[in-house]
UniProtKB/Swiss-Prot annotation:
One of its GO terms (molecular function) is L-lactate dehydrogenase activity. Substrate binds at residues 83, 89, 121, 152. InterPro entries: L-lactate/malate_DH (IPR001557), Lactate/malate_DH_C (IPR022383), Lactate/malate_DH_N (IPR001236), Lactate_DH/Glyco_Ohase_4_C (IPR015955), Malate_DH_type3 (IPR011275), NAD(P)-bd_dom_sf (IPR036291). Signal peptide: none annotated. It is an enzyme of class 1 (oxidoreductase). Its EC number is 1.1.1.37. SUPFAM superfamilies: LDH C-terminal domain-like, NAD(P)-binding Rossmann-fold domains. Pfam families: Ldh_1_C, Ldh_1_N. Catalyzes the reversible oxidation of malate to oxaloacetate. This is Malate dehydrogenase. NAD(+) binds at residues 10-15, 34, 96, 119-121. One of its GO terms (biological process) is tricarboxylic acid cycle. The active site is at 176 (proton acceptor).
């Protein structure tokens, strides 16, 4: 039986960590691509040499040539300049838009049936760029955002309550940036509404920490941005696709009227399976939640304005 083929564009910390998770879960063969000669080849070889120890069986290939990605089932775009202290995700747009545009076009050229998962920041803008550059149907190009943001909020809630991380569920909507919308109303600890367990003022602090979650790690690392949690979040999306799990996952999706917005990418709850985003779930938001979502989408539009797309 043919193994699934997963191509990762960008062999930096996020791409390499994602490859590690994919290999450990045996989701398929991996192609690790980067412009830096020797880097993807070295990381691929290093990871493959862990196979006899860890007991996974998959081929991992490093390359500088998009032709080696031909026939991919899924491609993940992580390539781009990483954040440094003091930078917002939006500060990366002028550099990363060129990288993502080329990557999406090359993926579509060599793997016209592939799904594309975008990870490069600013995420929602890059997801839109990739969608337009690829020419693929909207459900086949989507971004990793709410899973990571939700994981951060879940972590902070679990630590606050002293409970298992697994027992906290939540939903984060909107852009993957400072205006993201963690929905406290949809946050539960072991099926108990978290509003019953944590005072409102403390919950507001945890929401704000979630919005600044990426920046907090950037400030601590000083040389780059997060990669363990992003790698795990990407892998959860890949598993949903490759195993056709029909998972309900918050993803950056191209909106065509959903939640009152068109021609923009933003984080919304979706059903993810073999077809990519197979359905966008529209929730009835409160007036306050809708206003926050609208502000978040407006921030994404503001970054998109002026780009040649």
């Amino acid at each position: 039986m043919r193994r699934k083929k997963i191509s990762i564009v960008g062999a930096g910390n996020v791409g390499a960590t994602c490859a590690h998770w994919i290999a450990a879960k045996e989701l398929g063969d991996i192609v690790l691509l980067d412009v830096a000669e020797g880097v993807p080849q070295g990381k691929a070889l290093d990871l493959m040499e862990a196979a006899p120890v860890e007991g996974f069986d998959c081929m991992i290939t490093g390359t500088n040539d998009y032709r080696d990605t031909a026939g991919s089932d899924v491609a993940v775009i992580t390539a781009g300049v990483a954040r440094k202290p003091g930078m917002s995700r939006d500060d990366l747009v002028s550099i990363n838009v060129k990288i993502v545009r080329q990557a999406a076009a090359e993926i579509a050229r060599y793997s016209p049936d592939a799904l594309i998962i975008v990870v490069t920041n600013p995420l929602d803008v890059m997801c839109y760029v990739a969608y337009k550059a690829s020419g693929l149907p909207r459900g086949k190009v989507f971004g990793m955002s709410g899973i990571l943001d939700g994981a951060r909020f879940r972590t902070f809630v679990a630590l606050e309550l002293g409970i298992s991380f697994e027992d906290v569920t939540t939903l984060v909507l909107g852009g993957h940036g400072d205006h993201m919308v963690p929905l406290v109303r949809y946050t539960y600890a072991g099926a108990i509404p978290v509003e019953k367990l944590i005072p409102a003022d403390r919950l507001a602090e945890l929401v704000q920490r979630t919005r600044q979650g990426g920046a907090e790690i950037v400030e601590l690392l000083k040389t780059g941005s997060a990669y363990y949690a992003p790698g795990a979040a990407i892998t959860q999306m890949l598993e949903a696709v490759l195993k056709d799990k029909k998972r309900i996952l918050p993803c950056a999706a191209y909106l065509d009227g959903e939640y009152g917005h068109r021609d923009i990418c933003a984080g919304v709850p979706t059903i993810v399976g073999a077809g990519g985003i197979e359905r966008i779930i529209e929730l009835e938001l409160t007036a306050e939640e809708q206003a926050a979502f609208d502000r978040s989408v407006s921030a994404v539009r503001g970054v998109l304005k002026g780009l040649d797309i």
